[in-house]
From Swiss-Prot:
Pfam families registered for this protein in UniProt: Anticodon_1, tRNA-synt_1, Val_tRNA-synt_C
Taxonomic superkingdom: Bacteria
This protein's UniProt keywords: Aminoacyl-tRNA synthetase, ATP-binding, Coiled coil, Cytoplasm, Ligase, Nucleotide-binding, Protein biosynthesis
Protein name (record): Valine--tRNA ligase
Catalysed conversion reaction: tRNA(Val) + L-valine + ATP = L-valyl-tRNA(Val) + AMP + diphosphate
Length: 919
């Protein structure tokens, strides 16, 4: 792995080669250590045919930081990779490709279509895993799993069969979210609530055998054909006399009852609600309470079926809507139409308006499974980070409904249920198992269920199916429960809760000890990133760079709303006039870590990435300096540490303790702050400068100079190890160069033990001395700058009011002061000549100005400056003393003027101080 450290830091040159070496070395594998202490993360499996988006990049970077940290800490780490078959998403992609050729899946038939999907999976399934490699992810690739692998498919069957045999899985007719385009039930996660401006139609319903009438309001007039009741509040005096009477349902020959139910809000609208149990989730629950018939009026493609009058049969739902409104108006039963803001449930993949639809599906009794999963969090067996997310979890779990697990798709795990001609269901591993289990003779025809499982069903088994369950494998015993789940808040219910339920039920233990919930990455304006907004950033583009033309093409191709193209192009050109620079994987990873705060929303700005690329560059250049000054030095015990050496070791020690603490609390943002401060502000800006001075100082002994070289080398090694989990590529490259100077070098930095803090390195006195030195040097530099003394010019320094501690610090650091503040002589004198003076921690620093500055000319210049500032102070004071201005101007304008006044007054005081210092 030895490589030259180039003059310039170029991420592209180092990243690919390093990754290939890591993967070839087998260092990512679990079981590489005898340690009984394990650390396991299950990668939330991304869609097999997908590509890496910002959320993936963000979460994968955080997972990799945890894995690399624990691996270097000596634990047996398993990061289990894999991909999800993503039923609906993948089937839609392949269907679109076939449709472009004029072929439907029905033309091919199920078997041939599924073969086509497998072909597509093999063709494009490697994209996301290659992108994971590009970002530096280090999972155990030899254990990669796919949710449709045989082992995982067998686990899905075993799980369902057990649930069925235990009475927790059943087939029933219930209301589901139905996508008429896909002709399948979809999960709540795949429902987008889209804001639309619609209408509210008020219809008149005549009461049977009476002159009375009731007015109801609806946003979906066509559903009135499926009404089974009208509900009123039991305490609504306007209607109590009507409860139990019948309504002549217009446009039909049916009568429906008037019922009383607490669900109805008396004060909303007319206080009367039409009840359509087969086409509304709330109505469905009320229908069950009142034993109302469930009349389905739609087919699976959302046309009206034979349960409606013949006039409406076969009409599309929206055509039927128009016809119903027209017919009600013709009968004089349309009271009024009002504009109404709606939230329309829409399929997030198809854009189709979804329908609550009554259909036979397979369900899992969720309340039974939820109870132990709730208790596990209540008892503290699982910790949510941040803690407040457990409230979201509890809210969902305590109000859980039975889970519809069947989907009307062809791609996925087919439900292991068979039916005879009478419709009886038989559940088993395969047809032979079913016949044996239920004693079915060969002449009894049975047919397998056409449906597949909801993708979340197989995903819920991921923490243990990937480890070999239902077999009791050594891996299952060793790595379950896992250590932490890193995921987004949007799938706490859909995935986290279901893994908890299945983990508790099938493994009798929680699937993970910690659940770290990340925020949502938004753009620099705080907007959610979406293709339709044209503000999506691709992590790989941030790593490798992309031209403006390519970025525009990427953002405007295949838009759902082509009219947005011009707006997207304009915004993109404004934000990225030159395209996106290549920042490298390390800078992108460091940015992700820096953004991982406790916030729910995270604004991503490429300026941050650029800043962290500069950080990497700073580390690279400091490392080059170290190598260039070590010559043939190799770490040895023949050294003596000076005050600056002890200081940087002590600072490193504190930073090391802080990093461990922050990682234990998942405060990645604080980890980056700590490492950034250590590297940039302490090692590079100060210690490297001290080292330059010390190595040129002929008065130092060989042992003392060895102390500097030892510290330069070993502190750099520790910095590289500390930072490696965050910025693995650059730290590996520098380590390979540093190895020549180490006496205990490893093949790769991944084998270096993660640094730990130790009391022996604490040096509070050295820290005090160097803080004192930094204050003195910084003050002297500022003083020189104030009066325009050239940086290259060496000057004298007179010190006054010198306490014993100051003398001690001066003795320890005099060489550094002289070199870093360009001082040629330090004199003790309590009556200095005309000087520029500053007091630092009680010590008076004086720079004699004779021969350096024309004092009279400088005073004249400062007088002019004072006159200008006084004019500004007077002008603003006059404005603020004007009562009319203060009472009439906006608060912000008045506040701005007050700020100006404070600023000018401060500048005036400082300038006057400068003048007085000249005597």
């Amino acid at each position: 792995m030895t490589q030259e450290i180039n003059k310039n830091y170029n991420p592209k040159e180092i990243e690919q080669a390093n990754y290939q070496n890591w993967e070839a070395s087998g260092k990512f594998a679990c079981g590489n250590t005898d340690s009984k202490d394990t650390y396991t993360i299950m990668l939330p499996p991304p869609n097999v045919t997908g590509t890496l988006h910002m959320g993936h990049g963000f979460q994968m970077s955080l997972m990799d930081i945890l894995i690399r940290y624990n691996r270097m800490s000596g634990k047996d780490t398993l990061w289990q990779p894999g991909t999800d078959h993503a039923g609906i998403a993948t089937q839609m992609v392949v269907e679109r490709q076939l449709n472009a050729q004029g072929i439907s899946r029905h033309d091919l038939g199920r078997e041939n279509f599924v073969s086509k999907v497998w072909e597509w999976k093999e063709l494009s399934g490697g994209t996301i895993t290659s992108q994971m490699r590009r970002i530096g992810a280090s999972p155990d690739w030899d254990r990669e799993r796919f949710t449709m692998d045989k082992g995982l498919s067998d686990a899905v069957k075993k799980c369902f069969i057990k649930l069925y045999e235990d009475g927790l899985a059943y087939r029933g007719e219930r209301l589901v979210n139905w996508d008429p385009k896909l002709k399948t039930a979809v999960s709540d996660l795949e429902v987008a609530q889209v804001d639309k401006q619609g209408s509210l139609w008020h219809f008149i319903y005549p009461v049977a055998d009476s002159d009375e009438k009731i007015i109801i309001a609806t946003t979906r007039p066509e559903t009135m054909l499926g009404d089974m009741a009208v509900a009123v509040h039991p305490e609504d005096e306007r209607y109590t006399h009507l409860v139990g009477k019948m309504i002549n349902l217009p446009l039909t020959d049916r009568q429906i009852p008037i019922i009383a139910d607490d669900y109805v809000e008396k004060d909303f609208g007319t206080g009367c609600v039409k009840i359509t149990p087969a086409h509304d989730f709330n109505d469905y629950e009320m229908g069950k309470r009142h034993n109302l018939p469930m009349l389905n009026i739609l087919t699976d493609d959302a046309t009206l079926n034979t349960n409606v009058p013949s006039k409406y049969q076969g009409l599309d739902r929206f055509e039927a809507r128009k016809q119903v409104v027209a017919d009600m108006e013709a009968l004089g039963l349309l009271d009024k139409i009002e504009p109404h803001a709606l939230k329309v449930p829409t399929g997030d993949r198809t854009g189709e308006i979804l329908e609550p639809y009554l259909t036979k599906q397979w369900f899992v009794k969720a309340d039974v499974l939820a109870k132990p999963a709730i208790e596990a969090v209540e008892k503290g067996d699982v910790r949510f980070v941040p803690d407040n997310w457990k409230n979201t979890y509890f809210a969902w779990m305590r109000d859980i409904q039975d889970w519809c697990v069947s989907r009307q798709l062809w791609w996925g795990h087919r439900i292991p249920a068979w039916y005879d001609e009478a419709g009886n269901a038989y559940v088993g591993e395969d047809e032979a198992d079913v016949r044996a289990k239920y004693n079915l003779a060969d002449d009894i025809a049975i047919k397998q269920d056409e449906d597949v499982f909801d993708t979340w069903f197989s995903s819920a088994l991921w923490p243990f199916s990937t480890l070999g369950w239902p077999e009791q494998t050594p891996e299952l015993a060793k790595y379950y429960p896992t250590s932490v789940l890193v995921t987004g808040f949007d799938i706490i219910f859909f995935w986290v809760a279901r893994m908890m339920m299945f983990g508790m039920y099938f493994m009798n233990d929680v699937p993970f000890r910690d659940i770290y919930i990340t925020g949502l990455i938004r753009d620099s304006e705080g907007q959610k990133m979406s293709k339709s907004k044209g503000n999506v950033l691709d992590p790989v583009d941030l790593i490798d760079g992309i031209s403006l033309d390519e970025l525009l093409k990427k953002r405007t191709t295949g838009l759902m709303q082509p009219q947005m193209k011009a707006k997207i192009e304009k915004a993109t050109k404004k934000e990225f006039p030159e395209g996106i620079s290549a920042y490298g994987a390390d800078a992108v990873r460091f940015t992700y870590a820096a953004l991982a705060s406790t916030s729910r929303d995270i604004s991503f700005d490429t300026a941050r990435v650029e800043g962290y690329r500069n950080f990497c560059n700073k580390l690279w250049n400091a490392s080059r300096f170290v190598m260039m000054n070590l010559d043939d030095y190799k770490v040895c015990d023949n050294y003596e540490l000076g005050v600056a050496d002890k200081w940087i070791w002590s600072v490193l020690n504190t930073a090391t303790a802080d990093v461990h603490r922050h990682l234990a609390n998942y405060r990645f943002d604080l980890v980056t702050n700590t490492i950034y401060d250590l590297v940039w502000n302490n090692y590079c800006d100060w210690y490297v400068e001290f080292a330059k001075v010390a190595l040129k100082d002929d008065s130092l002994s060989e042992q003392q100079k060895n102390g500097v070289k030892y510290t330069l080398t070993k502190v750099l090694e520790n910095i590289l190890a500390l930072a490696h989990p965050l910025i693995p590529f650059i730290t590996e490259s520098i380590y390979q160069q540093l190895k020549a100077h180490l006496n205990d070098a490893k093949d790769t930095i991944m084998d270096v033990s993660y640094p730990v803090a130790t009391q022996a390195l604490e040096a509070p006195e050295a820290e005090k001395a160097i803080v004192w030195l930094q204050n003195v040097v910084t003050t002297l530099r500022n003083m020189r700058s104030e009066v325009g003394i050239k940086p290259s010019l060496e000057i004298s320094l007179i010190v006054k009011d010198v306490a014993d501690k100051d003398r001690e610090y001066l003795a320890q650091t005099e060489g550094f002061i002289k070199a870093l503040a360009r001082i040629n002589n330090i004199e003790f004198n309590d009556n200095p000549p005309t000087s520029l003076s500053q007091i630092v921690e009680g010590l008076e620093l004086n720079i004699p100005l004779a021969g350096l500055v024309d004092i009279e000319a400088e005073k004249a210049r400062l007088d002019k400056e004072l006159d200008k500032l006084k004019d500004e102070v007077d002008r603003v004071q006059k404005k603020l003393s004007n009562e009319r201005f203060v009472s009439n101007a906006p608060e912000a304008v008045v506040a701005a003027e007050q700020e100006k006044l404070a600023k000018y007054q401060e500048l005036y005081a400082k300038t006057l101080e400068k003048k007085e210092a000249l005597g």
